Design a protein with these regions (language model features):
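N-terminal leader/targeting segments and the immediately adjacent pre-domain N-terminus
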Residues: 1-18
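Mg2+-dependent prenyl diphosphate-binding active-site environment of isoprenoid biosynthetic enzymes
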Residues: 14-15, 21-187
Length: 187
């Protein structure tokens, strides 16, 4: 990769990170505890490739990083919600994510579910607010694409197939379906 592309990617990662750090800072109960659980997973690190790709796609389509930043952050929120739910005992029952205890290990299953739900709803709210500020329908279209890929024919379909295939002998077509929907379907 060219040095200027690496610099752009790192600058975009830092931009997204700063934006995410400004989310969910309410200090009253009950939101404070919920926001703490949401931030725990959202700010647990990661490469932020999905939001970086979102910013670059927007630029390629004539938009700016500033216009796309709420959508990029929303993509990361949706991704994080899916990881929180995937780690739950009823799903993959993972104890660690990115080298740290998973949300349900730190906050309990109930708050982990609510944190995931909260992130998904916050993503939709964030995109809705941003779309309302745009003079054309690009924001609504972006929101529709993101939520469709996160929904019942996208990531949720992959997770459902993963759950239903528990105990089956892995087949190439099954693994490909799960990966293309559960892992790769989110823009």
């Amino acid at each position: 990769m060219k040095p200027e592309n690496l610099r752009r990617m790192e600058a975009d990662r830092a931009l997204v990170e700063r934006y995410l750090e400004g989310c969910f800072l309410y200090d009253g109960e009950p939101q404070q505890t919920l926001f703490k659980a949401m931030r725990y997973s959202l700010l647990a690190g990661g490469k932020r490739l999905r939001p970086i790709l979102t910013l670059n796609f927007a630029r390629a389509c004539g938009g700016t990083a500033e216009q796309a930043l709420p959508f990029a952050a929303a993509v990361e929120m949706v991704h994080t919600y899916s990881l929180i739910h995937d780690d739950l005992p009823a799903m993959d029952n993972d104890d660690l994510r990115r080298g740290k205890p998973t949300s349900h290990k730190v906050f309990g299953e109930d708050l982990a579910i609510l944190a995931g739900d909260g992130l998904l709803n916050a993503a939709a709210e964030l995109m809705s607010r941003a779309a309302l500020q745009m003079a054309d329908s690009r924001g609504i279209r972006a929101m529709e694409i993101i939520m469709r890929h996160a929904g019942v024919t996208g990531m949720i379909a992959g997770q459902t197939r993963d759950v239903l295939s528990e105990g089956e002998t892995p087949r190439e077509d099954l693994v490909a379906y799960i990966h293309s929907h559960k892992t790769a379907d989110l823009p």
